[in-house]
């Protein structure tokens, strides 16, 4: 531990063995709160490398139970959170719609830290059992193409270190790790990050973890694809990383103001979700979700480009099938 701390104090990247040792100790609660605080802050100041992030994620996954084997190339659109802008739950609503279109969505998430409503909060408030046992989860997924994996059930180190991390008043490597440690190990990911500078780092981490296809995005300071501003993207395709910017024009959608996406409380988030699924949501809410679903369709080769993905999603919403789909998820999550 002393060698690890000294390396970080001198702003040196840790090698793979040191990262694996460090996170194994963290998992087994062999690191004191003072040491953990020092390590997280030193990593933050140095800047976490993609190798440190990917090896830490691999170590955490090795200690996380895998609830079932699907035999599919699963998809996740879990983001880092932490943008503090208190918008509707874009990625969670997008995951519900995408799964109703047949995409195999394994949604990894937790409760809110910086927003009014995290993915777990929204789903729970909608009536979904977010703490499904492995049998319930597999059954729900097989019948709906949607499964929610509540992070604290699979990663105790996150849960136990949460009070300390909260007292640091800064984002740490744990924020980056959240979207990378889905126990079902999805092969396709749409991953939002709270800072544009993380896009390339996280894309490299996904590549190192063996993800086949991904897009890491930051849209106007949010960890989502947005229509009110430029979305910076790093796309992992054919084992190469392509870096580019997206705007509303790339989706053939109109721009909307960020303020229209912001909410005052969790109740508003629930209502926004239900309205979108029933195809009666505000245009600003619906269209930003549609852009994110379109990106999932593109990444999974169901749409040839983003504009086709948008048209497919808009046509699907007209059927109101996503709302019926949600009711089925709610019922099966409690079965």
Swiss-Prot record:
SUPFAM superfamilies reported in the protein's UniProt record:
Nucleoside phosphorylase/phosphoribosyltransferase catalytic domain (SSF52418), Nucleoside phosphorylase/phosphoribosyltransferase N-terminal domain (SSF47648)
What does the entry comment about cofactor binding? Answer: Binds 2 magnesium ions per monomer.
Q: What is one cellular component GO term in this UniProt entry?
A: cytosol
What Gene Ontology terms describe what this protein does at the molecular function level? anthranilate phosphoribosyltransferase activity; magnesium ion binding
Pathway as given in its UniProt record? Amino-acid biosynthesis; L-tryptophan biosynthesis; L-tryptophan from chorismate: step 2/5
Where is Mg(2+) 1 annotated to bind?
Answer: 91, 224
Where do the annotations place 5-phospho-alpha-D-ribose 1-diphosphate binding?
Answer: 79, 82-83, 87, 89-92, 107-115, 119
Query: Which cofactors are named for this entry?
Result: Mg(2+)
* The keyword Transport belongs to this UniProt entry's keyword annotation: no
The region annotated as signal peptide is none
Write down the EC number: 2.4.2.18
Q: What family does the database annotate? A: Belongs to the anthranilate phosphoribosyltransferase family.
What function does this protein fulfil? Catalyzes the transfer of the phosphoribosyl group of 5-phosphorylribose-1-pyrophosphate (PRPP) to anthranilate to yield N-(5'-phosphoribosyl)-anthranilate (PRA).
Q: Please identify the protein, giving its name as recorded.
A: Anthranilate phosphoribosyltransferase
Q: Which organism is it from?
A: Helicobacter pylori (strain G27)
The top of its lineage is:
Bacteria, Pseudomonadati, Campylobacterota, Epsilonproteobacteria, Campylobacterales
């Amino acid at each position: 531990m002393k060698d690890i701390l000294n390396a970080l104090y001198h702003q040196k990247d840790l090698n793979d063995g040191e990262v694996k040792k460090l996170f194994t100790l963290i998992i087994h609660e062999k690191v004191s709160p003072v040491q953990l605080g020092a390590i997280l802050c030193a990593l933050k100041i140095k800047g976490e490398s993609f190798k440190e992030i990917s090896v830490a994620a691999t170590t955490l996954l090795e200690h996380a139970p895998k609830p079932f084997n699907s035999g599919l190339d699963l998809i996740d659109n879990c983001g880092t959170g932490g943008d503090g802008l208190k918008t509707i739950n874009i990625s969670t609503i997008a995951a519900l719609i995408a799964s109703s279109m047949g995409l195999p969505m394994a949604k990894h998430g937790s409760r809110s830290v910086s927003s009014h409503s995290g993915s777990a909060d929204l789903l729970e408030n909608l009536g979904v059992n977010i703490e499904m046992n492995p049998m319930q989860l597999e059954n729900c997924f097989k019948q709906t193409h949607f499964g929610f994996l509540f992070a604290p059930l699979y990663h105790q180190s996150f849960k136990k270190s949460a009070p300390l991390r909260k007292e640091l008043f800064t984002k740490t490597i744990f924020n980056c790790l959240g979207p990378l440690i889905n126990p079902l190990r999805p092969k396709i990911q749409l991953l939002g990050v709270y800072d544009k500078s993380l896009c390339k780092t996280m894309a490299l981490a996904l590549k190192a973890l063996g993800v086949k296809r991904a897009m890491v995005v930051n849209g106007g300071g949010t960890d989502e694809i947005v229509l009110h501003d430029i979305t910076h993207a790093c796309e992992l395709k054919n084992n190469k990383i392509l870096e580019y910017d997206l705007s509303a024009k790339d989706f053939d959608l109109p721009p909307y103001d960020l303020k229209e996406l912001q909410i005052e409380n969790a109740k508003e988030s629930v209502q926004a979700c239900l309205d979108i699924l029933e195809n009666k949501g505000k245009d600003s809410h619906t269209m930003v979700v549609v852009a994110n679903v379109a990106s999932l369709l593109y990444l999974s080769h169901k749409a040839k480009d983003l504009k086709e993905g948008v048209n497919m999603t808009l046509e699907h919403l007209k059927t109101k099938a996503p709302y019926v789909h949600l009711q089925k998820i709610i019922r099966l999550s409690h079965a």
